[in-house]
Amino acid sequence: MLLLLLAVTAAAAVGAGPGKAVQFLAVGDWGGVPEPPFVTPREAATAAAMGRAAAERGADFVLALGDNFYYDGVRDEWDPRFQETFERAFAAPELRALPWFVLAGNHDHHGNVSAQLAYSRHSERWRFPHYYYSLRLHVPGTNATARLLVLDTVLLCGATDDFGVGATPRGPPDAAAAEAQLSWLQRRLAAARHDRYVLVAGHYPVWSVAEHGPTQCLLRLLRPLLRRHRVTAYLCGHDHNLQFLHEDGVGYVVSGAGNFMEASQTHRAAVPPGAARFFYGAPESPGGFAHLRLDADHPTVRCRERY
């Protein structure tokens, strides 16, 4: 299937939260279940905790890191899953007031990702302009800016089964489209050299100690670019836990605990020595997400669960 992928650039209004900072919540793998009630207890608990964090800590937007609808995405833009798994599940007033910037995961690609793009016309808070896109953020009260580059790592690397130990992507469905996305990313990273912070987001991890481990395709294609352009952090989901890793000046945030929680650290030996700084995947956990804050002079990431 030939996919026509367009670069999209948008501006995000920030500064709603307390303090002179860009703040946002990052949650991945949050997509409920395909039968009633279409949400899991962990998704409900995570949604409630995100609402409290937005109210108490502040947030300007939510970054949804893929696997938005388990297990096979959505059929069309009128699919009731948009209401059952998203609109009604994340219904706290503090969340309803925030835009959600969305990317696709492998389970979304089992269904109709174009329908998720089209749903942006039906919901004021669902912002999914294209498969990959760029956001420029302004730190309020300062001259500092941040660039967020949102990717489709499934189109870069291929599909995979989310529930298989070490399952690896099978290669891009369209090599030319994958190359176009990579070229777009290279240009955007080069253009972001004057931004205080540069964040890149995708579904598959670059580094992970957990069940799926490092994504070899991204180690080959993405890691050199992140290091060369001194990217602040790469954010992802796919592994169902919370992690922070740091390698060669780049932070790696894994936030895939919105719907499931897994304790596996099968691939701890596969990451560079000393890179893994934080891991949380307690089976009894109610789920979790990350809260990121970009001040004028430093970034902060906090991993959170129900509190």
PLM regions with names:
Residues F24-A26, V62-A64, V102, V200, ...:
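Residue-level marker for buried hydrophobic side chains located in beta-strands
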Residues D297-V301:
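Hydrophobic residues embedded in beta-strands of well-ordered beta-sheets
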Residues M1-A12:
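Cleavable N-terminal signal peptides of Sec/SRP-targeted secreted and luminal proteins
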